[in-house]
Amino acid sequence: MKWTFENAKIKGRIVLTDSLHEDPDLLKDKTLYKFIWVDSGEVELDIDHQHVVLKKGQLVPLSHLHHLEFLRIEGKCYALMFNGNFYCIHGNDHEVSCNGLLFHGSSHVLTFVLSEDERRKIDTLTRIMQEEFLSTDQLQDEMLRVLLKRFIIL
């Protein structure tokens, strides 16, 4: 599955997919910030020449500057990606901005272990996002941005 929304006016883009590893064009896009998390099994990644193994319930945030390569996938993982024009240019709070600790706070790859409650919330948010990607009303852009902000806050 792959859901994409693009706002041509501001050149903003947001993507939710469970097949990033099969999409070379999306993998090569150097404008996208990424959240990758494992729903089941484990995923082996190379992130800026650092070997990372993500297991069920783990999430990694990556900036548009990170180089990402999928080495092995055993299970199911998701990626939520967006460019700076979609989210970062909107002057978001420093707690949820693109320039904060989440994306640029360490020289090491940050890995988060999600609690059962956080996993449930992410699952709920991504289901709502999937519905919003299919919507074509005038509020779609803003709704996806609000859902992304909520995802970041989690």
Label each PLM-derived region with a short phrase.
Residues 2-8, 71-131:
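A hydrophobic/aromatic-rich effector-binding and dimerization subdomain
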Residues 34, 113, 143:
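Amphipathic alpha-helical recognition patches that constitute DNA-binding helices
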Residues 44-46, 62, 67-73:
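Short beta-strand His + acidic residue motifs that chelate non-heme Fe in jelly-roll/DSBH
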Residues 51-53, 60, 76-77, 86:
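Short, surface-exposed beta-strand-loop junctions and turns on beta-sheet-rich folds
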Residues 54-67, 81-82:
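Conserved metal-binding segment of the jelly-roll/cupin
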Residues 117-154:
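An amphipathic alpha-helical interaction segment
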